């Protein structure tokens, strides 16, 4: 059982023109795939999906998707937003199958930022989400990045983070130890020091 429920209708009218007509009627196109079943094109009421994803946790939780009354558990795989206005234009969902791993993007929560700031550091968040691979039951709501012990000059990489039990960082599994955040000296101070040295 999930706290996140979304209603949808099967869609047969496909193509760019059809998608445009959908958006004009306050609906959005979507697709659900995976789980050894055919991909299915969907129509979702724009207001419903916008309301659901006002809650950040919906991005990293199992969603009960009701397609014409038939229920299936899914996670959001990708979402396309309007570049200027930010509203949702299209969504991709993946069916959840018990015992099978899925990949999903999970939000990053930064904590302990006060400590490096007090030491004169400025913090740059390099990522806002991390792609993980795990079973649906292990899908974390977010990944916590603790900056309380970070010094000026510190770069936090994926390998510095503790993955929750049963969870794997996709980039790290492919040998890509991405930077997540860094603590650097304030730019103004650095420029002043450079000027004094000249």
Curated annotation (Swiss-Prot):
Transmembrane feature ranges: none
Keyword Lipid biosynthesis set for record: no
Annotated GO biological process: translation
One Pfam family cited in the UniProt record for this chain: Ribosomal_TL5_C
InterPro entries: Rbsml_bL25/Gln-tRNA_synth_N, Ribosomal_bL25/Gln-tRNA_synth, Ribosomal_bL25_b-dom, Ribosomal_bL25_C, Ribosomal_bL25_long, Ribosomal_bL25_short, Ribosomal_L25_dom, Ribosomal_uL5_bac-type
Gene3D superfamilies: Ribosomal protein L25, beta domain, Ribosomal Protein L25, Chain P
Key words of the record: Ribonucleoprotein, Ribosomal protein, RNA-binding, rRNA-binding
Cellular component GO terms held in the UniProt record: cytosolic large ribosomal subunit
GO terms of molecular function: 5S rRNA binding; structural constituent of ribosome
Domain of life, per lineage: Bacteria
Homology family: Belongs to the bacterial ribosomal protein bL25 family. CTC subfamily.
SUBUNIT field: Part of the 50S ribosomal subunit; part of the 5S rRNA/L5/L18/L25 subcomplex. Contacts the 5S rRNA. Binds to the 5S rRNA independently of L5 and L18.
Described function: This is one of the proteins that binds to the 5S RNA in the ribosome where it forms part of the central protuberance.
Official protein name in the record: Large ribosomal subunit protein bL25
Species in which this protein is naturally found: Pseudomonas entomophila (strain L48)
Lineage: Bacteria, Pseudomonadati, Pseudomonadota, Gammaproteobacteria, Pseudomonadales
Gene: rplY
């Amino acid at each position: 059982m999930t706290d996140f429920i979304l209603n949808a209708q099967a869609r047969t009218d496909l193509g760019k023109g059809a998608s445009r007509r959908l958006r004009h009627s306050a609906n959005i196109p979507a697709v659900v795939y995976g789980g050894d079943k055919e991909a299915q094109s969907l129509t979702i009421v724009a207001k419903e999906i916008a309301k659901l994803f006002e809650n950040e946790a919906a991005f990293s939780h199992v969603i009960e998707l009701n397609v014409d009354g038939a229920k299936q558990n899914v996670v959001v795989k990708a979402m396309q937003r309007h570049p200027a206005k930010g509203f949702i234009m299209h969504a991709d969902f993946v069916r959840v199958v018990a015992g099978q791993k899925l990949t999903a993007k999970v939000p990053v929560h930064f904590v302990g930022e006060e400590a490096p700031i007090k030491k004169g550091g400025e913090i740059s968040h390099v990522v806002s989400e991390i792609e993980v691979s795990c079973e649906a039951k292990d899908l974390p709501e977010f990944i916590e990045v603790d900056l309380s012990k970070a010094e000026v000059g510190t770069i936090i990489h994926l390998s510095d983070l503790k993955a929750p039990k049963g969870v794997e960082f996709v980039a790290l599994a492919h040998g890509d130890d991405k930077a997540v955040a860094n603590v650097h000296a304030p730019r103004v101070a650095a420029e002043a020091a450079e000027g004094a040295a000249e």
